[in-house]
Design a protein with these regions (language model features):
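Glycine-rich phosphate-binding loops of nucleotide-dependent enzymes
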Residues: 2-261
Length: 261
């Protein structure tokens, strides 16, 4: 059976911090329109992998392809220009600004100026655009004109995810998007992640929350000691066996072929 082409693929990524190897010839393959969960213990290289794919760090070795073409990201700006958006744990939202202003942060819409110069920021256009986009994603927040500092943790996370999805053309990567959220707000974010996928974007989801991983992931990438040890189908493997492989209790080579993905 022919495998699906990769939307984003990396092979042999290496990154060291002094005597510590964060990425030890790490590989990853993300298929078009899927949610790929990346799991692993602390020190497995999950965050370093995301940073390498988003241009936040430059690996010492290895290759990255986007839609089949080789790419090199010298900075996060390069990755964003290529259509990859990333939501880190700090969210990078401005609490004192409105939801609409945060959605367009760094990409503000401006009114035409005199003699071709940049005009004033078009706040009304941004507000209208934000309302339309949030409605399309099913994000239920009372007013897009309210400040982010008035929102709950789950709502802030939704703003960050929606902003990434608004400008991504290929891939959205998320680092622990449901961390420290309660059940209701965690489910709200998971629903949004599903809707992002439904709009045709591929998603990489880094998470320690195994129930959340098994709820939304199409495939699970298991990392250990800086490299990929297995990719499994959450519909065919138990959570317990997945954790056993992740922690090194079970040899990934002993997994039955039908659970691999």
């Amino acid at each position: 059976m022919k495998s699906a082409p990769a939307a984003l693929r990396a092979r042999g990524l290496v990154k060291r911090y002094g005597h510590v190897t964060a990425l030890a010839a790490a590989d990853i393959g993300l298929r078009p329109g899927e949610i790929l969960a990346v799991i692993g213990d602390n020190g497995a290289g999950k965050s370093s992998l995301i940073k390498a794919l988003s241009g936040a760090l430059r690996p010492e070795a290895g290759e990255i392809w986007l839609d089949g073409a080789p790419v090199q990201f010298r900075s996060p700006i390069d990755a964003r220009r290529a259509g990859i958006e990333t939501v880190y744990q700090d969210l990078a939202v401005a609490p004192a600004m409105t939801i609409a202003e945060n959605l367009f942060l760094g990409r503000e819409l401006r009114r035409p100026g005199v003699l071709g110069r940049l005009g004033m920021i078009g706040k009304r256009r941004m507000l209208e655009g934000c309302m339309a986009w949030m409605s399309a994603l099913g994000v239920d927040i009372r007013s897009m004109a309210q400040r982010v500092e008035t929102l709950s943790g789950g709502q802030r996370q939704c703003v960050a995810v929606a902003r990434a999805a608004a400008f991504a053309r290929h891939v959205v990567m998320m680092d622990e998007p449901t961390a420290a959220l309660g059940v209701r707000e965690g489910n709200m974010v998971l629903d949004l992640i599903r809707r992002v996928r439904e709009r045709g974007l591929s998603v990489i989801l880094v998470s320690h929350n195994m129930p959340h991983v098994f709820e939304v992931a199409d495939r699970i990438h298991i990392a250990r000691l800086g490299r990929r040890v297995a990719v499994v189908d959450p519909r065919k493997i138990s959570m317990g066996d997945t954790v056993a492989v992740m922690t090194g209790v079970q040899d990934p080579g002993e997994l039955p072929p039908h659970v691999l993905a």
